[in-house]
């Protein structure tokens, strides 16, 4: 069996999958926030419970809101204080007596989609999350590309370029501070939160993303104008990723991925932002939704 964990700041979810990545069982518990020992023991208890339930010793994959440096084994998980700057892989392997693998949760999302039967034909899959933040993961031949420090795919912490700033008003463009310490990171613009902040600052009215989209479909001209601008901003930013990575398919997840107009408008806007010889990759909506993280974590032990 394949055990996949989604490690969040408020909850830890375990899901058990068979070798075909079909879910057999799942359980959620609260995330211990202060005690590292309690955090480790929570995961260990869930693993042992699954072992007993399925009469096997399953593989253990973790999806975390951060990364583990491959060189040092130290986790960087700033919103889970109990496990931040701790050797989580080594300590879990010692307690469980088996190999443990961990990846950023956006990488796990992308890996889950890459292992879908419809996407398995593609050698490269770029997963992008337009949710609370903007993140991504790159999959080559069914494997996560993590980079030398585990930080590959942190597309949300690249910054707006010249064309994006001009689109947003040049010297008058809204510039947002990012939690990483930089300014004008894509995380603060292409996320659901960024969508709302941009509308507020450019249209002078604070609305939820859902309300903005409802106005767009109702034909409200301020919403229509804003959405077209946002699509162009996505085309500039995602176009840069396509130029560098040249993926076969892009899968979108997160709350804004439910905005169906994206799949109509973005492919039309992208060619103007790419080299003439480039192909616009297939852009599609994620299939697994909230289950993508645990499913991708379980897939960390699969290979083509």
UniProtKB/Swiss-Prot annotation:
One of its GO terms (molecular function) is zinc ion binding. Zn(2+) binds at residues 157, 178, 180, 185. Its EC number is 2.7.1.59. It catalyses: N-acetyl-D-glucosamine + ATP = N-acetyl-D-glucosamine 6-phosphate + ADP + H(+). It comes from the Bacteria. InterPro entries: ATPase_NBD, N-acetyl-D-glucosamine_kinase, ROK, ROK_cs. Pfam families: ROK. Keywords: ATP-binding, Carbohydrate metabolism, Kinase, Metal-binding, Nucleotide-binding, Transferase, Zinc. Pathway: Cell wall biogenesis; peptidoglycan recycling. ATP binds at residues 4-11, 133-140. GO terms for biological process: N-acetylglucosamine metabolic process; peptidoglycan turnover. NCBIfam families: PRK13310.1. Belongs to the ROK (NagC/XylR) family. NagK subfamily. Catalyzes the phosphorylation of N-acetyl-D-glucosamine (GlcNAc) derived from cell-wall degradation, yielding GlcNAc-6-P. HAMAP family: GlcNAc_kinase (MF_01271). This is N-acetyl-D-glucosamine kinase.
């Amino acid at each position: 069996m394949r055990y996949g964990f989604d490690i969040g700041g408020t909850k830890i979810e375990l899901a058990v999958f068979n070798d075909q990545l079909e879910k057999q069982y799942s359980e959620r518990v609260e995330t211990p926030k202060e005690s590292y020992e309690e955090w480790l023991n929570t995961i260990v208890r869930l693993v042992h419970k699954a072992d007993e339930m399925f009469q096997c010793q399953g593989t253990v994959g973790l999806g975390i809101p951060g990364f583990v440096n491959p060189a040092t084994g130290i986790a960087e998980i700033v919103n889970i204080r109990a496990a931040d700057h701790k050797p989580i892989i080594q300590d879990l392997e010692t307690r469980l007596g088996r190999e443990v693998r961990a990846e950023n949760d956006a990488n796990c999302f992308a890996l889950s989609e890459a292992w879908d039967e419809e996407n398995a034909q593609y050698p490269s899959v770029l997963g992008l999350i337009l949710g609370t933040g903007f993140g991504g993961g790159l999959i080559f031949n069914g494997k996560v590309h993590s980079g030398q420090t585990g930080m590959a795919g942190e597309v949300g912490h690249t910054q707006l370029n010249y064309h994006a700033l001009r689109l947003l008003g040049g010297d008058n463009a809204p510039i947002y501070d990012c939690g990483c310490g930089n300014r004008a990171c894509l995380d603060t613009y292409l996320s659901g939160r960024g969508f709302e902040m941009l509308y507020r600052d450019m249209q002078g009215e604070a609305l939820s993303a859902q309300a903005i989209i409802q106005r767009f479909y109702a034909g409200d001209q301020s919403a229509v104008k804003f959405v077209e601008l946002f699509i162009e901003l996505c085309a500039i930013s995602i176009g840069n990723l396509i130029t560098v990575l040249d993926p076969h398919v892009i899968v979108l997840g997160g709350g804004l991925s439910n905005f169906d107009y994206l799949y109509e408008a973005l492919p039309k806007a992208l060619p103007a932002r790419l080299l003439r010889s480039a192909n616009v990759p297939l852009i599609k909506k994620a299939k697994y939704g909230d289950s993508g993280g645990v499913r991708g974590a379980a897939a960390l032990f699969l290979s083509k």
